[in-house]
């Protein structure tokens, strides 16, 4: 690592190494070995002639002759012992041995070689001669080599100086890495290990790395070693002198001395021990502040070392000695650390590894002591100067030391707080890092990252892994400022860095930078009326620079303040160190995972969008509340942001803040949620961070992701950054970061944690968080008027009312909201549930604002409705009203979308079923299950607000299915409502292209709404809510299809591609995610799929072992995602289903493998597997793909939303299916979903009804529910184990709708439209026909559900959609669901379906 210290093995070891160096072969020995080639070849040939295995014995004999030594004393003692024991048999042997002892070592070796070869050869003749010849040859070789070496040594008084630097470096590096085991006075250079050298030769570099990298540039490490002994002495005398003075003068003197010292061997040999023991111990912790910094200083040269630390040299020598004495024990390092720290504090004020406090504890190896010192040092100007210099010089230079130094110091288990984290946290001194460094950072990131010096320094001091190498951030502060600052401030550089650097590298940075980046776009462009996330989404390509600049400003200005406040408070409340540690650990773990603390911390700083700091997001509501108590918006955003933080853990982000109890760590895609749980407060931050991290790579996404209004990274970051980075986009369509991010987010939502644990945690945590939220949200919410407002990023005109009930309900309904982490959302839900009409009215009122109070109300109300009024008629009424709003008021399309979404959520309680919102061409509402949560994507206006709301019955079930998150996409914000906590769940996960601020459709279209933002929700239904379903087998699980116990529970990949009408121009760039894209490609269908805009939503319910393969809309069917709309239009004509059938002649056949597989293996499919997002390969690929395609086709059949419908289907349809078609339920559900989606938009119920009337009729009727014991069981017993069907049914049916609800729905559907539709699918009236008619049934059910909803919602499109969702669940469930949702509509819908 320290080239300077490199011992020239060739020169230096010459004799001393060969003779005295017990460890590595001396240079002479090495050269001899090189010269052995010819001899070895000759010997091999000779041995082969004797019939001896040359391969084995050549090397053995040579080794024996060249290296073996003989201990005469021991041999004689042994002989005596043997003689004493047996004078008989061993007498001769002993005598012979004695004779041997009389022999010379050479003779003994020869004898041993002869005996060895004779034992291996049949022929005894010729071997002695051979050995003699061999020995003579070897002697010649050795004499020649010795002559060469002597000449070499004589020729140059200082062979080391003579030796080429590369040779020195190589040898020195080698010995540094592999120090000799013995303490013999070998040449110091030789002895120098990476540890030693870093102490002796590069310990200056270590100090320089932390203190003055330039000083560390003293690269004559081997010489340094020789002169270092002197220098050490000199330094010890000079220690008092300033580090720079000493280092510079001594580095020069020492260099000269070292180079000039021809007595390198002498001094090093003597001094090596000293150094190894003395300096090594103390100085051992070279600049572990950053391995790269130290390496840089070392590589930069020992000059810098000498300059920077004359003291350091002494210290290092001492440290080395101590190390050597202690065998480089962590203890000795630690012991040295303190002294070293003190010295370092002097020397490295700006030591990158200024995590002195934590370093001591964390770094027991003494690697970090330097960091610790660096942290302590920040106070010392000199140290700072050195540090700055060193940082500049050794920014990314890594001293060779890191090779052998335990990298664990740098690399920490992803799940743990890495030592780095701890160091960084401890490095709060880094806040003192150096005013220079801080200033530098502050220029780019100071506002955000450095708002709390702690935080920034944490990042800087922490260092980062770049290209797999750990670079100490402090050393890289300049670049880090770009990197960290950029990432924090969304600097254009940061974007580059983020892309170039892996998340793991910038984890600590990402906490802040991504958030800031996300905020920046919002702050600048989003501030212009669009949420950052939306802005970012829209301008992903152009955002990088703009976002950075504007975002920086916003962050630095307003957001910085928020961040600082948050960071400061966050640090104080959570403890900056703890947060950072957690953050870093989480980040280190995986960007994919939502880092619990780090993300939150960053999120916190970016809690709000440009108006609201994301910082609030940092620490869930609690932290945010404290930090942002005065900043309601921030807090709301924080809550939202928390959820957004989780956003990348699919939808947990939404819940993160409010659902912090949800333990996004658990729910957050479960990847980093574990950390999150450790860091409850940090969790939310983590979510944001993760999402930030995940989306950090896309600077634009960052900013946008942290939607200003949304204040949750989800808005934009989830779309691309978080998901892309974290989950490595599973969908081919990563072009749309919305979809990408969501895609990433979705997978592993709950896979990480056990659902029950998550649920319990969510519930407990929800209560805690609710209380926190209640305490905090009221302040923030009232301030901001509403959490929804902050979530939606739109001030709700009705926010006053909403805000009040929101706030009130935060307290009151928080428990009621089933663990609404965020009381606001829950209260909104409650409000919706209680006053569905009110919510609808609000939505109507806010037609102009679309995203004002209405959107917020809707978001919350939607969830509340779905949750509180699971299958209540009031919900239906609200839904109907909202639906009408959708259909009636395109201008209030967003509002309507919200209403529809609400309607859809409540209505199509099954998360799999797309809600009616999709029905209306203006506003496409997609209901889908994301992260185990039933979600609806709704487009409002061209804004295409998406609201994903849990089904009304989710109230209990979602809560129970804590793992399942409900993603509410309201307006441009995506809110994640965890199954358990809806209130927090309504945080925006991400903002759609359109931001609430830009309510107008032009906004969606023009604003760069994201060209179509598609978000993929990859949810592990089982992981999220399997346990809950098991716990409450049936009705209460919003995600009936995701029964944790149901191995069949599918991970739902929902890709929502949203292209606002205004974004039509962007549509080319927008590619619907494979599964989610419903209508991205064909705008013709976009009315269906994308409400006003082209919203493509495709949800594929995938059985746990289902192979999920992103399927493009075109691949699935001509209509692709748009088919849902298209088909809904066709549905009335019954074309889409046939079309679907045409595409896949037997869509169910395709699904059957999945369903059967899931049913058969579902039980065996471990919940943990599902939770972990792993799908068993057991599912046949063709079957899986077919099922996926079929489900997609079915989706397209019913609507592009089929996938959504499918997933909802999983809940509702699947329930019915399970009742109707246990094995086929998966397929049928998928298909039904498709049909439902078709119906959803245009009453695909027509088509569905026609195809599935009979089938639907059978399953739909409550009697049929009873008819199908499986379904009944699912509804009632919810016994997954009852049958394969049963678990399916239970998963799909009972959780979605209580038996009574399902029955009611069925009754409604049947009574209203069930009979009418029966005729259509009557051919499959019985269970036998379930499989065949399942698709039809699903369609019919969709239609029926749509009809019910239609009646309820007064808008056929919406109702159709809703009903579709319901019917997609299954005919029975669909009917029932539809009935539940909208009794009268169902009839109408079915009539239309029949049409």
Curated annotation (Swiss-Prot):
This protein's UniProt keywords: ATP-binding, Nucleotide-binding, Phosphoprotein
Q: Where is the composition biased (Basic and acidic residues)?
A: 230-269, 337-346, 369-391, 1346-1359
Compositional bias, Basic residues, is annotated for 313-328
Residues annotated to bind ATP: 89-96
Residues annotated with Phosphoserine modification: 814, 1080, 1194, 1338
User: Where is the segment annotated Disordered?
Assistant: 146-166, 205-391, 1110-1132, 1346-1395
Q: Which InterPro entries match?
A: DUF4603
Ranges of biased composition (kind: Low complexity): 155-166, 205-222, 287-301, 349-358
> Which branch of life, at top level?
Eukaryota
Q: Name one GO molecular function term.
A: ATP binding
**Which PANTHER family does this chain map to?**
DNA SEGMENT, CHR 5, ERATO DOI 579, EXPRESSED (PTHR17611:SF3)
Record's protein name: Uncharacterized protein KIAA0232
